[in-house]
A protein has these predicted regions:
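Short catalytic/metal-binding and nucleic-acid-binding patches
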Residues: 1-149
Length: 149
Protein backbone atom coordinates (compact mmCIF):
# COMPACT_ATOMS: atom_id res chain seq x y z
CA UNK A 1 0.00 0.00 0.00
CA UNK A 2 1.38 3.40 -0.94
CA UNK A 3 0.59 6.38 1.25
CA UNK A 4 1.14 10.05 0.60
CA UNK A 5 4.15 11.64 2.27
CA UNK A 6 3.22 13.15 5.63
CA UNK A 7 -0.01 11.12 5.70
CA UNK A 8 0.54 10.44 9.38
CA UNK A 9 1.26 14.03 10.46
CA UNK A 10 -2.22 14.25 11.98
CA UNK A 11 -2.43 11.56 14.68
CA UNK A 12 -4.43 8.47 13.75
CA UNK A 13 -5.81 6.23 16.49
CA UNK A 14 -7.18 2.72 16.59
CA UNK A 15 -9.70 2.62 19.42
CA UNK A 16 -12.08 0.04 20.75
CA UNK A 17 -14.76 0.59 23.32
CA UNK A 18 -17.36 -1.66 24.85
CA UNK A 19 -20.79 -0.69 26.12
CA UNK A 20 -22.66 -2.36 28.91
CA UNK A 21 -26.40 -2.83 28.60
CA UNK A 22 -28.54 -5.21 26.61
CA UNK A 23 -27.08 -7.75 24.23
CA UNK A 24 -27.07 -6.76 20.56
CA UNK A 25 -27.42 -3.12 21.67
CA UNK A 26 -25.17 -1.49 19.09
CA UNK A 27 -26.30 -3.52 16.08
CA UNK A 28 -29.94 -2.51 16.51
CA UNK A 29 -30.95 -0.10 13.75
CA UNK A 30 -31.90 2.86 15.95
CA UNK A 31 -28.70 2.53 17.97
CA UNK A 32 -26.48 2.25 14.88
CA UNK A 33 -28.13 5.43 13.68
CA UNK A 34 -27.28 7.18 16.96
CA UNK A 35 -23.60 6.26 16.57
CA UNK A 36 -23.57 7.23 12.89
CA UNK A 37 -25.30 10.55 13.56
CA UNK A 38 -22.78 11.52 16.25
CA UNK A 39 -19.74 10.40 14.25
CA UNK A 40 -20.99 12.10 11.08
CA UNK A 41 -21.72 15.32 12.98
CA UNK A 42 -18.24 15.29 14.50
CA UNK A 43 -16.78 14.79 11.02
CA UNK A 44 -18.88 17.57 9.47
CA UNK A 45 -17.64 19.86 12.25
CA UNK A 46 -14.06 18.74 11.45
CA UNK A 47 -13.44 17.43 14.98
CA UNK A 48 -12.30 13.98 13.83
CA UNK A 49 -12.25 11.88 10.66
CA UNK A 50 -13.42 8.25 10.69
CA UNK A 51 -11.14 6.16 8.49
CA UNK A 52 -12.54 2.67 9.25
CA UNK A 53 -15.05 1.15 11.66
CA UNK A 54 -16.62 -2.10 12.84
CA UNK A 55 -19.67 -2.24 15.08
CA UNK A 56 -20.19 -5.44 17.07
CA UNK A 57 -23.27 -6.04 19.26
CA UNK A 58 -21.58 -4.51 22.33
CA UNK A 59 -18.37 -2.97 20.97
CA UNK A 60 -17.28 -0.40 18.43
CA UNK A 61 -13.84 -0.32 16.85
CA UNK A 62 -12.75 2.85 15.07
CA UNK A 63 -9.74 4.14 13.23
CA UNK A 64 -9.98 7.89 13.57
CA UNK A 65 -7.79 10.78 12.53
CA UNK A 66 -7.53 13.78 14.83
CA UNK A 67 -8.60 16.97 13.09
CA UNK A 68 -9.58 19.83 15.43
CA UNK A 69 -9.63 17.80 18.64
CA UNK A 70 -7.20 15.38 20.20
CA UNK A 71 -8.47 11.94 21.15
CA UNK A 72 -8.32 12.95 24.82
CA UNK A 73 -10.64 15.90 24.16
CA UNK A 74 -13.01 14.15 21.74
CA UNK A 75 -13.47 10.80 23.48
CA UNK A 76 -15.13 11.95 26.77
CA UNK A 77 -17.72 14.04 24.91
CA UNK A 78 -18.47 11.22 22.45
CA UNK A 79 -18.62 8.69 25.28
CA UNK A 80 -21.03 10.68 27.44
CA UNK A 81 -23.27 11.94 24.62
CA UNK A 82 -23.72 8.56 22.94
CA UNK A 83 -24.28 6.73 26.24
CA UNK A 84 -27.01 9.22 27.13
CA UNK A 85 -28.58 9.02 23.65
CA UNK A 86 -28.51 5.21 23.70
CA UNK A 87 -30.21 5.21 27.11
CA UNK A 88 -32.84 7.68 25.91
CA UNK A 89 -33.49 5.81 22.66
CA UNK A 90 -36.22 3.83 24.39
CA UNK A 91 -34.97 0.50 23.15
CA UNK A 92 -34.80 -1.16 26.54
CA UNK A 93 -36.26 0.21 29.75
CA UNK A 94 -34.05 0.48 32.79
CA UNK A 95 -30.78 -0.09 30.94
CA UNK A 96 -27.93 2.15 32.00
CA UNK A 97 -25.46 2.55 29.16
CA UNK A 98 -21.81 3.20 29.92
CA UNK A 99 -18.79 2.88 27.67
CA UNK A 100 -15.87 1.05 29.25
CA UNK A 101 -12.77 -0.96 28.33
CA UNK A 102 -11.39 1.76 26.07
CA UNK A 103 -8.35 0.53 24.20
CA UNK A 104 -6.31 2.90 22.12
CA UNK A 105 -3.25 2.66 19.94
CA UNK A 106 -1.51 5.48 18.14
CA UNK A 107 -0.89 4.44 14.53
CA UNK A 108 2.56 5.69 13.64
CA UNK A 109 3.15 4.35 10.12
CA UNK A 110 1.66 2.49 7.16
CA UNK A 111 2.54 -0.93 8.56
CA UNK A 112 0.73 -0.17 11.82
CA UNK A 113 -2.25 1.22 9.89
CA UNK A 114 -2.52 -1.96 7.84
CA UNK A 115 -2.25 -4.16 10.95
CA UNK A 116 -4.90 -2.14 12.82
CA UNK A 117 -7.25 -2.06 9.82
CA UNK A 118 -6.91 -5.83 9.48
CA UNK A 119 -7.61 -6.31 13.20
CA UNK A 120 -10.62 -3.98 13.05
CA UNK A 121 -12.15 -5.59 9.96
CA UNK A 122 -11.59 -9.15 11.23
CA UNK A 123 -13.18 -8.53 14.66
CA UNK A 124 -16.53 -10.05 13.51
CA UNK A 125 -14.69 -13.14 12.26
CA UNK A 126 -12.67 -13.65 15.45
CA UNK A 127 -15.81 -13.11 17.59
CA UNK A 128 -17.86 -15.57 15.51
CA UNK A 129 -20.33 -13.12 13.93
CA UNK A 130 -19.16 -13.72 10.34
CA UNK A 131 -16.91 -15.99 8.32
CA UNK A 132 -15.56 -13.14 6.21
CA UNK A 133 -15.45 -9.38 6.93
CA UNK A 134 -16.93 -8.76 3.49
CA UNK A 135 -20.13 -10.49 4.62
CA UNK A 136 -20.48 -8.55 7.88
CA UNK A 137 -22.97 -5.69 7.58
CA UNK A 138 -21.77 -3.37 10.31
CA UNK A 139 -18.33 -2.32 9.12
CA UNK A 140 -16.75 0.17 6.77
CA UNK A 141 -16.78 -2.37 3.92
CA UNK A 142 -20.58 -2.58 3.75
CA UNK A 143 -21.35 0.60 5.76
CA UNK A 144 -24.92 -0.32 6.71
CA UNK A 145 -24.62 2.20 9.58
CA UNK A 146 -24.11 5.05 7.11
CA UNK A 147 -20.99 6.51 8.70
CA UNK A 148 -19.25 8.97 6.36
CA UNK A 149 -15.91 7.59 5.26
Amino acid sequence: MDFLPNAFDSPIWYIGMQINGASELLTQKQNREILAKRLNRDQRNALIKVEEYTILPDTIHLIIREVALTLEMWWPVFRDATARELEDSGGIDGVTCNWHNLTQELIIDAVAFERCAYDLLYQPVTKGYATDPGFYEFNSINNVAGIDL
